[in-house]
Amino acid sequence: DTLFFPSGTTVYIDGGARVYGNIFTEGAHDVNIFGRGEVHPDGRGAGVWVRRSKNVRIDGIVVSQLPIGQCDSVELTNVKSISYYGWGDGMDVFSSSNVILDGVFCRNSDDCAAVYASTQGFKGGSNNVLVKNATLWADVAHPINIGGHGDPNGMDTVQNVTFRNIDILDQAEKQIDYQGCLAINPGDNTLVRNITFENIRIEDFRNGQLVNFRISFNPKYCVSTGRGIQNVLVKDVTYNGSGENLSIIAGYDLSL
C-alpha cells in the first residue's frame, strides 16, 4: 500500500511499529515524519519517497530506502536505511537543493549516499547538499557517489556538496568501474564542482578503491560523457586497512 501525505502533515511512527508499504510526499510542503518505527514495502523498494516537495523533515525512523527527487529544503536526521536486494540504494538525492543528511546510518546493497542531476523523471542539477555525522556501509557499489546521472541534452551541474565527519565501514564491489569509497563520476554532460570530503574515517574494506574521481562514459547508464570535475577538497581522510585497489583520478580518454 502507498500512503500520500499532503502539505502541513505531521506523521509519528511509534517505536516498535512496522509500516508495510510506501510513504510518499509528492508535491507537498511543510511535512514532518518522525518516530522510531520502521517503514518498508513488503519486498523491495523505497519505504519513504520525497518528490517535488519543499520543507520536509524526517527524523529517527528506519527505512529500506529514502530517495529525494527534485526537492528544496529537505532534512533527514538520525534516519537508518537498510537494504539487501539489488539496486538497493540508501539515500539518493536527485535534482535537489538545500538538503541535509545528519546522523544517518546506511547499510545498503548499492550506493549508500549519492547526489545526482536529472534522472528518473527529475530535472535539473543539485546544489547545496550536506551529509554529516554519518555511518556508511556499502555491501556493493559506493559508500559515496556523486554525479553519475544528468541530462545529456542539457547543462546540469552538481555543486556545493559536502561530506563531513563520516565513518565508512565497508565496500565490497567486484567491478572496477563501480569502485571508490569516495566516487565522483560525472556522465551525461554533467559538471561536478565545489565538492568537499572532510574528516572521513575509512575502515578496512573487502574489495574496492579509496578514491575514484573520473570523467566517465558508461553506456549502461549514460549516453554521453560528463563535462568535468572542478574544485574538490579532500581533507583529513584516514584509512585503517590494506589491500585496497589502486585509486583513480582521471579525465576522459577520447581514444576509447
Segment roles from a protein language model:
Residues 1-256:
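Extracellular/periplasmic carbohydrate-active domains that bind, remodel
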